[in-house]
């Protein structure tokens, strides 16, 4: 298999997902009119309405039946397993990269003759098994620290501020000094904390057990020249992981003992209401922030400075959103699904929905003329032009969903004071070896 995460970085920015294994034999039966039909199991809850609207419009234009079902946050793997076991299984689904593909390889049709593959600006970003194109990314995504410009400008104007402009915040040490000072002066700034709540409800915990955990993996893999899923990790940069997580806990809107029930919506609301200056999330968050009343000139995004190579560190950019066509579906349904995808990425309706309404940045040539309206995407594009090194999405190599969950549980226990950091180390290092072995036994 050849899939180069770092070549994906060379394109541009914007959701996160995880997908797992199933060994069922579901297939999809085509509709009676011979046109085939489409069933898309969508990963992104925040784009559910937009996908349903696209399905309705496509059916209106072509007469082809399109069904869209959306998995609740954190349940995609479970729902995909369930749906694939049915007679009318999804004709279109997603995997997160090579690890997800390994679990679903018997269900992936060759997409080399489909429009999404043909439209790729850089065909290296496709997911391949030998010469077979098994998945095509439809969103290049970026995350970091979203920041509120007006709150930071207010802080920069204070006497004794640890930074005088956003350009001064270019390292972990400066970021922490600013966050600590903002927390101490929160009444002057009219905020509840420097950072939004680090919630560990399933709608939020992925930000820490997956996205933040990507950074120690990235730096370890860079140092050790790891290019494929390793059987074990050392945890070389766990001290830096702890430093950033501690900052999130100490300089927060919320007492750490309350984090187990805090949600993604809570963090989004805190940030949109101006209760916090920093919010770890990605380009996909713009639609929710916009709905909450934020304006494009209110926000931008900084790297999650990790204290390893801050001078060169850029935002975290990659893809975990690969479309796959179900090879078990009827030929008519596979053709109908490919035709639907062609319409989605080449029609005015589809391009507008994906780029504007969903706020995604795609790797397709057909989107070249799209004006960027998402300020977080603009930050990602600017970051790529900065000469800095974008951090790869190495969490695609995480061995299992269980590894993430065990790490998340250890992080929450640590945050609440009911566990210690050694348990986080154990979940990270020992848990990796255990889950890798379980996934590769036999």
Where are the regions that the model predicts?
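Paired acidic/hydrophobic, glycine-rich loop segments that form the ligand-binding mouth/hinge
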Residues: 91-94, 277-281, 300
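Glycine-centered hinge/linker elements that transmit conformational signals in sensory
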Residues: 179-180, 224-261
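Extracytoplasmic/periplasmic solute-binding protein
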Residues: 132-138, 143, 173-229, 276
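Extracytoplasmic/periplasmic substrate-recognition and gating elements
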Residues: 292-359
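C-terminal capping/gating helix-and-loop segments adjacent to ligand/active sites or protein-protein/ligand interfaces
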Residues: 261, 317, 360-362, 379-434
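Conserved N-terminal structural module of periplasmic/extracytoplasmic solute-binding proteins
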Residues: 3-14, 18-19, 23-100, 113-116, ...
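Hinge/lid segment of periplasmic solute-binding proteins
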Residues: 96-153, 298-303, 385
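Short helix-initiation/N-cap motifs at beta->coil->alpha
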Residues: 70-79, 170-174, 259-273
